[in-house]
Amino acid sequence: MEKSSNNIVPRIGLGTYNMSSEEAEQMTYAAIDYGYRHIDTAAVYRNEDGVGRALNRIFTDTDLNRSDITITTKLWPGGLLKVDRVKNNEGTIKSLEKSLRNLDLEYVDLYLIHSPHARGKRLEQWETLLSQQEMGKIKNIGVSNWGINHLEELNDKGYPLPAANQIELHPWSQKPELVSYLQDNDIDIIAYSSLVPLSTWRHKDGENSLKTDQMYKDSEDANSPFKKLAVKYNVSEAQILLKWALQLGYAILPKSIQIDRMKDNFDLTFAIDEVDMELIENLDRGGSVTWEYGDPLAIK
């Protein structure tokens, strides 16, 4: 499996957002068995234990070793809502240790600060993770949903920049300025919510987001650009969206609880031609839609 530009994570990983612990166990095992070598989870997903059970089964049932699998999880920093206490040094360490227990691992390959909501504690959390990296509990430290201003806080203090930034990226939210900054600073780009333009993305009750009614209408349009491209290349709309990201050099984290779709998300051997990549580039609509409480990139 080809890895991302800085060799941090394999280019295609399994996302586990909104999976139950049991679903995460089932899909992690099935995905690794099929060829995935990167699993992405988070403390706030509450399914790290399921991922951990699957890993133990994989290491028992197959010849794969711990070093063959890349595991990403995330620190919930706090601060999203008033009742969401921001984590200090001690809270950050406790969260990491709990994730390691849940995963039944001695270290994680990539540990991300899940969002920039911790405002006054971002630097303290980063310092703490640097110390935990020195202790061998984390191989690579990164962030998620951080904008240029958040990253510049680290730069201004002379801290090493993150190994990766996991952000919402898809043809409707391409973030060219942030992407350029990340590339210029050798920060790996990991795209999540690649499938926002699909009509099936968060369409069930309780799956909240900032995706507008017009966006849903456009997703359902029988003549949408993605449907036309899917026909042209004889693939699914999801495969078009995922391949677009791969061809731009991003790592991706498609999530599915259906085995067939999980396999389709991995089988991306076709290529989108230059003309169609330019067509997709012109479909950008701007900001993020994944977080119902507002775009975390806008946090100061």
Can you annotate each of these PLM segments?
Residues M1-I69, L195-L198, L297-I299:
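N-terminal binding-site loop/beta-alpha segment at the start of enzyme catalytic domains
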Residues K3-S4, G52-R66, L100-D104, S131-Q133, ...:
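Acidic (Asp/Glu)-rich catalytic clusters
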Residues N18-E23, A42-G50, G78-K87, H117-K121, ...:
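Acidic-and-aromatic substrate-binding clefts and catalytic sites of carbohydrate-active enzymes
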Residues S20-I32, R85-L103, E124, N149-L151:
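Short, acidic/polar
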Residues R37, E106-D109, K139, A163:
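Short acidic/polar active-site loop segments enriched in Thr and Asp
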Residues N65-L80, L110-P116, N145:
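A short, structured active-site edge motif that brings together acidic residues
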Residues E90-L112, S131-M135, I187:
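CE4/NodB-like, metal-dependent polysaccharide N-deacetylase domain
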Residues P116-K300:
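Beta/alpha (TIM)-barrel catalytic core signal, keyed to glycine-rich beta->alpha loops juxtaposed to Asp/Glu
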